[in-house]
């Protein structure tokens, strides 16, 4: 049976009520998110490499971002310690602002019946308005739909490039969770929870994306992070100019794997 984890701050009762009002959520195990907002920076520096974060991302980390990373890592620890989860099996991790597509469970079941060939499967994305938003294809293209693998009502494939997709909902293999835990047993974490490019390049943890999405952030909720990350929106013309090259990269990446 698929293990499902919901990351939620203890104070966010209404968020959990909204999440659990959705169908197929009764089997989620709630993990109390690590609240870093009241900790001082010296305390945080003891458990998170603030200086390495700044060197890597060229900016200061926020307390909320540290809490987010530590919370996801703590869930990975639980996955690793769970003897009921096989090394090559997936667990589902969601945040409490997750809004599921009406056919979420049907498509999730279909996905899990496939040989997905990636350690992380991004079922959703943050800061997106719709499950099949136009920006998904323009900014984060995959290969041509007829070359994608299809199951249920969704396609899955490698994106043209791993990117910051948020952590609203994803599948992760136990073997990948173990790799994260091995990393932090040697050095303090310094990364953002959704730096999938770093995970691919440094930890050899690959990810695939699902199109259309089956999870998005609930639009009635506002993120707990101190600041919303993400690049400034480019105008449509600039996006369209970059699109053909991104599409070529996506096609090559999927043909090579």
From Swiss-Prot:
E.C. numbers: 2.-.-.-
InterPro entries linked to this entry: Glyco_trans_25
Keyword annotations from UniProtKB, A to Z: Glycosyltransferase, Lipopolysaccharide biosynthesis, Transferase
Superkingdom of this protein's organism: Bacteria
GO biological process: lipopolysaccharide biosynthetic process
An MF annotation (GO) of this entry: glycosyltransferase activity
Signal peptide: none
One protein family per Pfam: Glyco_transf_25
Family note: Belongs to the glycosyltransferase 25 family.
Name of the molecule in the record: Lsg locus putative protein 4
Taxonomic lineage of the native organism: Bacteria, Pseudomonadati, Pseudomonadota, Gammaproteobacteria, Pasteurellales
């Amino acid at each position: 049976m698929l293990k499902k984890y919901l990351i939620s701050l203890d104070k966010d009762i209404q968020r959990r009520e909204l999440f659990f009002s959705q169908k197929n959520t009764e089997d989620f195990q709630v993990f109390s998110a690590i609240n870093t907002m009241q900790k001082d920076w010296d305390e945080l520096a003891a458990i998170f490499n603030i200086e390495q974060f700044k060197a890597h991302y060229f900016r200061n980390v926020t307390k909320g971002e540290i809490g987010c990373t530590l919370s996801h890592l703590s869930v990975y620890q639980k996955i690793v310690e769970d003897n009921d989860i096989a090394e090559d099996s997936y667990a589902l991790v969601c945040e409490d602002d997750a809004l599921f597509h009406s056919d979420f469970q049907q498509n999730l079941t279909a996905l899990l019946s496939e040989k997905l060939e990636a350690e992380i499967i991004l079922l959703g994305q943050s800061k997106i308005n719709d499950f099949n938003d136009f920006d998904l294809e323009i900014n984060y293209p995959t290969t041509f739909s007829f070359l994608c693998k299809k199951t249920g009502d969704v396609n899955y494939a490698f994106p043209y490039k791993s990117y910051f997709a948020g952590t609203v909902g994803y599948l992760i293999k136990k073997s990948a969770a173990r790799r994260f835990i091995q990393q932090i047993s040697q050095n303090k974490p310094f990364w953002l929870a959704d730096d999938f490019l770093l995970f691919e390049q440094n930890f050899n943890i690959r990810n695939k994306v699902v199109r259309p999405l089956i999870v998005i952030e609930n639009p009635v909720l506002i993120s707990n992070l101190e600041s919303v990350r993400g690049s400034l929106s480019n105008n449509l013309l600039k996006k369209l100019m970059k699109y053909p090259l991104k599409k070529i990269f996506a096609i090559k990446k999927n043909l090579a794997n």
